[in-house]
Amino acid sequence: MKRQLKKLVFVEPKSTHLHIYSRVCIPRLGSVLLGTIMRSKGYDVRVYIEDIQAIDMREVLSADLVAVSAITSTAPQSYRLADTAKAAGAVVVMGGTHTSFMPDEGMQHADFVVRGEGEFAFQELVDAIQRGDGFG
């Protein structure tokens, strides 16, 4: 899979019910950190944390790559979003604690799953996609 990637959109969907972050203000910084890293490398980046800002689906549907973070309480929404982005032609990467522990489930909705902390793996994955390396 060799693709020219310019526009990257990172999304953390909002849960429809209570979860670990509902009662305690603990920010999930993975998407913000990855977005900042990729912006510093010259990519056009958007980051949507739905608890803070509504997701602009026009941005998602026009992205070259959509990275979706999933915790267990947001997995259904995350998978629906991943399916929509994939149907629109984006490369879809899933990460977060849920897909780290359930990668086979994540791969049913994404092109790639990044497990664990993704600061280095995500950059390497994007570089490999651009070069078309190692993906058969």
List where the protein language model places each region.
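Proline-centered helix-kink/hinge sites
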Residues: 13, 27-28, 91, 103
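C-terminal accessory regions of radical SAM enzymes
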Residues: 2-18
